[in-house]
Amino acid sequence: MARPSPLCLLLLLTLLPPIVPSNSLLTEPPFRWRFYLHETWTQGNWLSTVTLATVDCQPHGCQAQVTFNFTSFKSVLRGWSNPTICFVYDQTHSNCRDYWADTNGGCPYAYCHMHVTQLDTAKKLQHTYRLTSDGRTTYFLTIPDPWDSRWVSRVTGRLYQWPTDSYPVSKLRIFRTYV
């Protein structure tokens, strides 16, 4: 059997893909999903909106929950309330989904599904509860399913000062965009 010529070996090496792993698998993609949390409230005759927080998904997608960290809600005084959030999308009872949704955001009745702030000084409850607080300076709002398409089209919720209040004090909007 004849040995291949050096020219033939050189040609073969240039045509074969490299065996060394590509760095493209190790680099972060140039774009990622970013979540925004906005609060809108009325103060006197003025309607105000502010971005409370943003959070990015992991570089290679939104496969795991994301958590907003922010210092306060603008429409609620810390220490004088127990902030509670209601979303229409996670209501299971028709009375909570279908009646006064624009006004109450899914919580016209006490039996509706509410996300009441849970005190979490050890930061261990964020996987169990949607809304937690360290009791001093920070609130944590967790999105358990960031891959769901509803977050692209903006999810609106209502913020209540207390879980027993009849009407919300502000509107929350959560959405994600590709940045």
From Swiss-Prot:
This is Putative endogenous retrovirus group FC1 Env polyprotein. Belongs to the gamma type-C retroviral envelope protein family. HERV class-I F(c)1 env subfamily. Ortholog of the human HERV-F(c)1_Xq21.33 envelope protein. Residues 23-179 are annotated as: Truncated surface protein. Residues 1-22 form the signal peptide. It comes from the Eukaryota. The gene is ERVFC1. Keywords: ERV, Glycoprotein, Signal, Transposable element, Viral envelope protein, Virion. The keyword Glycoprotein applies. Retroviral envelope proteins mediate receptor recognition and membrane fusion during early infection. Endogenous envelope proteins may have kept, lost or modified their original function during evolution. It is found in: Virion.
